[in-house]
From Swiss-Prot:
GO terms for cellular component: cytoplasm; nucleus. It comes from Rattus norvegicus. The lineage of its organism: Eukaryota, Metazoa, Chordata, Craniata, Vertebrata. The gene is Ccdc89. Residues 36-346 form a coiled coil. This is Coiled-coil domain-containing protein 89. Keywords: Coiled coil, Cytoplasm, Nucleus, Phosphoprotein. Residues 1-26 are annotated as: Disordered. Signal peptide: none annotated.
Length: 370
């Protein structure tokens, strides 16, 4: 120390008071710079700790959004099950309508068979009536022939034989009486035939009326059955069309829901990926914070060593160089802190944009599937 003081006095001969004042000023400036560095680093650490708490809140919000999306997926599955139940009910109604149609066809077949039986009976009655008319005509023609023969025989008797004629007349009288009896019998037969013909005609008219009535009723029933069949066919066609439309709408809805679900799952994966990336970024930021703390400790140690060297060397020029070096280090630390703060603000803005997009997507899904 005495040799160094001697060399300083030989190079620059300032007094001892000036050196003491310079040393005090340098010490005060170093203390102020150290306090400023410590305050800036404390503020950076506080901001980073606050940022990590916000990230924890954002993760909780992401978990709630994922739960809401799972609830929406459950709602969509329940809607799909309800549409499937409606399709099964329509299929059951279609099968019941088909069974009713087959039953109506069987009834129509039975009624057609009854109509054919009635027609065959009517044809049989008509044939019997024609036979009775033919028998009546034949009996009438035979009676006319007998009268003609009787007249011829009477004339022959009158011309040829008187006794024999009397005998013949007696015979004729007998024959006439017999003929009269036959005529009376014929009249009785005619009356009976007429009565039977009237009964047959009345029966025929009754049968015709009954047949017409049955034909009208059958026509009405056929028309009713035809209209019912048309209505059943119309209902079946409408039910089939409605079922086709429902199936098509269900398929379109399922496709749209699958597309939306795929989009939601993709966005969910993207959000999970972003959350993982943000976790990695937080880990990196924490590592950077630890590095900054280490740098701060090294800077404090460097400052301490610089002060010790300054006290040991007590050279103004060398101390100014050390101060500049420390100032450069402080500027570098401040710049790194500013960069870190800008990155954290950008990351926070990006996270808020993603959350707003997720809220809009959830609002759209709630609007589409209330």
């Amino acid at each position: 120390m005495p040799q160094k003081e001697k060399t300083l006095r030989m190079d620059t001969p300032p007094p001892d008071e000036i050196l003491g004042r310079q040393n005090e000023n340098l010490e005060n400036e170093d203390d102020e710079l150290g306090f400023k560095e410590m305050d800036g680093l404390r503020e950076a650490l506080a901001n980073l700790r606050g940022l990590s708490e916000e990230e924890k809140g954002e993760k909780a919000m992401l978990r709630s959004r994922i739960q809401e999306q799972s609830q929406l997926i459950c709602i969509l599955k329940r809607r799909s099950d309800e549409a499937l139940e409606r399709c099964q009910i329509l299929e059951l109604l279609n099968s019941e309508l088909e069974e009713k149609r087959m039953q109506e066809m069987e009834k129509m077949k039975v009624q057609n068979e009854q109509v054919q039986k009635l027609e065959s009976r009517f044809m049989t009655l008509a044939a019997n009536h024609e036979l009775m008319i033919r028998f009546k005509d034949e009996h009438k023609s035979e009676n006319i022939k007998l009268k003609e023969e009787n007249e011829k025989l009477r004339q022959e008797n009158n011309s040829l034989f008187s006794q024999a004629l009397k005998d013949q007349e007696n015979k004729v009288l007998q024959l006439t009486a017999h003929n009269k009896a036959l005529v009376e019998e014929l009249e009785v037969l005619k009356q009976r035939c007429a009565h039977e013909a009237g009964q047959a005609r009345a029966r025929e008219e009754e049968l015709l009326a009954l047949q017409n009535q049955q034909a009208c009723e059958h026509a009405k029933e056929t028309e009713q059955l035809r209209s019912q069949l048309q209505s059943i066919k119309q209902q079946h066609r409408q039910a089939t069309e409605q079922m086709g439309k429902d199936q098509e709408a269900n398929i379109n809805m399922n496709q749209e829901l699958q597309a939306r679900l795929h989009t939601v799952m993709r966005e969910k994966e993207e959000l999970l990926q972003l959350s993982m990336e943000r976790g990695k970024v937080l880990q990196n930021k924490q590592a950077e914070i630890r590095q900054l703390e280490e740098k701060l400790e090294t800077a404090a140690m460097a400052k301490k060593h610089a002060l010790e060297r300054f006290e040991q060397e007590a050279v103004a020029v060398d101390s100014n160089l050390r101060v500049r070096e420390l100032q450069r280090k402080v500027d570098g630390i401040q710049k790194a802190y500013d960069d870190l703060r800008l990155q954290s603000e950008a990351f926070k803005k990006h996270s808020l944009d993603l959350l707003s997009k997720e809220r809009e997507l959830n609002a759209k899904l709630r609007h589409l599937f209330p």
